[in-house]
Amino acid sequence: MQRLHLHLLSDSTGETLEMIAKAALAQFDGADVVRHFWPMVRSMQHLDRIMGEIAANPGLVLYTLVNAETRERLEQRCAALGLPSVAALDAVTDALQQQLGIQAKGRPGRQHMMDEAYFARVDAIQFTIAHDDGVGWENWEEADIVLAGVSRSSKTPTSIYLANRGYKVANIPIVVESPPPSMLFSLRRPLVVGLTTSPERLIAVRRNRLLSLNQAPETAYVDNEQVTREVQFARRMFADNGWPVIDVSRRSIEETAAAVINLYNERTAAGASGDGVKPI
């Protein structure tokens, strides 16, 4: 069966769009689909960057965009590439039938499926809360994703956001003086992703954190030399282990989570195609 790259574009969080795509794809047993998630598309410049990614992995484009100019630009660019673009609330199932080359089958029990999805999300949230900040490392193999990064690199909020999407996530702080559990380097099932940021951005975030706690704003925690050392140490660890890295310096939590989801989907697709699990 031919692989389909499915691009999901939204000018908001994209949660509704993702649910629509999941519901439609449930009609196609065994379909080889790689989902690419692009939320918060609110400028022409952002759209143009995404179109470069779409051109590299051509496929079906589903979108929920309110701005008429952005919609028109997307449709024009897709047409120029010879790619179908579909508003998500239109005939999603019909477009998937054409691209996948198989007939959608009527499937009863949709509400039951939604109930299962709801409980799976609750389970993911419970798992993620119980495995925050390096806690419960003995169970990391049960996770879908493990996020690693220095303190204040947005590991926890990104983990919670992903959990609300149904992913079981653990996260671990990378500390120079305290190496992480050895299990981190031998995980097979979870996707391990390194989160990094610039020392300048990290110092600003940490200083704000100290001020919010009414603590002295000038400590080793925000010392430029120390912070730079931490960031470099973490980056070397990521590189040595072949883990994909996301720079969160200029990303919102939603954008960081979307990047993680794309990495996860690509890794899952690589495994399903028989290529095995590879660093991304």
From Swiss-Prot:
Leader peptide range in chain numbering: none
Binding site for ADP: 149-156
InterPro entries in UniProt: Kinase-pyrophosphorylase (IPR005177), PPDK_reg (IPR026565)
Family note: Belongs to the pyruvate, phosphate/water dikinase regulatory protein family. PDRP subfamily.
HAMAP family per record: PDRP
Function: Bifunctional serine/threonine kinase and phosphorylase involved in the regulation of the pyruvate, phosphate dikinase (PPDK) by catalyzing its phosphorylation/dephosphorylation.
Protein name per UniProt: Putative pyruvate, phosphate dikinase regulatory protein
Organism: Novosphingobium aromaticivorans (strain ATCC 700278 / DSM 12444 / CCUG 56034 / CIP 105152 / NBRC 16084 / F199)
Origin organism lineage: Bacteria, Pseudomonadati, Pseudomonadota, Alphaproteobacteria, Sphingomonadales
